Amino acid sequence: MNIKNFFEKYNIKINNEKLFNEALTHNSYANEHKLKYSYQRLEFLGDAILQMYVSRFLFFNYSKLSEGELTRLRASTVREETLFRVAKDINLGALVKLGHGEYITKGYEKPSILADVFEALTAAIYLDQKEDGLVTWLGQTLFKYIKDSNFINDTKDFKSELQELLQSEKRSDLKYIIEKEDFFANENKILYTVSVNLNGQKFGVGKGFSKQEAEQNAASDCLSKLKKPTSN
């Protein structure tokens, strides 16, 4: 797929194509072709840029949310799962440059790679197009996804909800325990398996590529079991 044609759909006319090529180059491709660059540095910058512009977007568009709710919503917006979904929706995988081995294993469909590329492209667009171009890009991709989907309602703090439920029932001794850590060398990621224990008894299990995500999923699992009607 032609890079310039792809971005013209988003009213972005590329000035420095080298920046965009760098943002789309996975380190496996860089190693095979002996390149001195990959998307990692731009990914670093893109992560910081997203934090800033997502914060601003949420602040001005969701005036009724508290500081804590905005913080949780921002974390959910910039997490890997959300960026992956957006990248997949716009077929970003078709542009990513991968090494042979990574391509064979369908790296162009991997959540970690697509999320990283979205961050790197965000940085490239900011450097090439300045703020106006970046706002145009985010408005048609990430922010559009947030507005059009049920994202806000689906974004919940299950740990806080569980804590409040237990307090209302005067139950205590809540613990989150890491049961397992699986390391994925090809993605340089750790998949955590966490359990929720109440008074020494396991009530829920969750997985995630961060401890926080795994704990949230475990809390969600626990809540679904605690709220399930008991048969008489």
Curated annotation (Swiss-Prot):
Residues 3-130 form the RNase III domain. GO terms for biological process: mRNA processing; rRNA processing; tRNA processing. The keyword RNA-binding applies. Its EC number is 3.1.26.3. Homodimer. Belongs to the ribonuclease III family. Keywords: Cytoplasm, Endonuclease, Hydrolase, Magnesium, Metal-binding, mRNA processing, Nuclease, RNA-binding, rRNA processing, rRNA-binding, tRNA processing. It catalyses: Endonucleolytic cleavage to 5'-phosphomonoester. It is an enzyme of class 3 (hydrolase). Residues 157-228 form the DRBM domain. PROSITE patterns: DS_RBD (PS50137), RNASE_3_1 (PS00517), RNASE_3_2 (PS50142). Its cofactor is Mg(2+). Transmembrane segments: none annotated. This is Ribonuclease 3. Signal peptide: none annotated. One of its GO terms (molecular function) is metal ion binding. Pfam families: dsrm, Ribonucleas_3_3. The active site is at 47, 119. Mg(2+) binds at residues 43, 116, 119. Digests double-stranded RNA. Involved in the processing of primary rRNA transcript to yield the immediate precursors to the large and small rRNAs (23S and 16S). Processes some mRNAs, and tRNAs when they are encoded in the rRNA operon. Processes pre-crRNA and tracrRNA of type II CRISPR loci if present in the organism.
